[in-house]
Amino acid sequence: SLWRKIMKGLMLGIVGFCLLFSNTALCGDIDAGEARYAQNCGNCHGPAGMGLASYPKLKGKEIPYLIDRLNTYRAGTKIGPNSDLMIMMAQPLSDVEIANLAAYLNAQK
């Protein structure tokens, strides 16, 4: 579909930009993301984002999806059964921390 082609092009553009410029604020630092994940996320989402019980698997998810979800929770929007907890966990995160988390989780294939 046209939408899928647009999204694929956007994703390739983001990846290309990151490879060319390695800007941590846009691309994320995997090591910093791993440290933040261990501190904030691992107890519910499991080791390396594998998912536990009612907490979804995050491992290998696309970066734009992860950033969108964390930004949505950070804004206080409820989008799932664990929204209250996720809002509380996401609100203190900076844009850089969100990018780092997304980079780490995406790298867990």
Residue ranges: model-predicted function:
Residues D31-Q39, K59-D68:
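Sequence context surrounding c-type heme c attachment/ligation sites in exported
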Residues L52-K59, R74-K109:
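Axial heme c-ligation environment in periplasmic c-type cytochrome domains
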Residues S1-M7:
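Short, Lys/Arg-enriched N-terminal segments with co-localized hydrophobic residues
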Residues S22-N23:
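N-terminal signal peptide c-region/cleavage motif recognized by signal peptidases
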Residues K8-L10, D31, I67-D68, A107-Q108:
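Predominantly soluble domains enriched in secretory-pathway, periplasmic, or organellar proteins
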Residues L10-G16:
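Sec-dependent signal peptide hydrophobic core
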Residues G28-M50:
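Sequence/structural segment immediately N-terminal to covalent heme-attachment motifs in c-type
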